[in-house]
Amino acid sequence: MTDTSHLRSIREQVVQRHIAAEEDGDVAAVLRTFAPGRVSYSGDTLGGDLIGDHAVGAMLTAGLAAMSDLKIEILRLHHAEDAVITELRLASTHTADFDGIPATGRRVTYHMCAVFRFDGADLWQEAVYYDIATIKAQLTG
């Protein structure tokens, strides 16, 4: 196995552990997939960058409470020089306040692009891109 393919394998395993922990609702396990002291989430729908265990953990806790029984399907995965880029399909049940919308009990499905940024084998940021209007339409329609 070449150095490049070995590094890609390690990164892909980190991404898979990260996604599995999100599906399990295990915020501590999600945070452990990041390099120590380098926890960061980015995305316009998050209101800007979130940096550190506390900020990211609070966002994940609220998000996983609002959208329970989360299922994430990796549709595509691409390796870049310093990132793993994923196209995902997410499905969950709206069980608590989400962006000002009280729990509806509705099942929602949407697509997301998640870019997992690495320094070598160390994950230091996840940047997420999704259409919040698609989610809101399913919750209010």
Cite the ranges covered by each PLM segment:
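C-terminal and inter-domain tail/linker signature
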Residues: 1-141
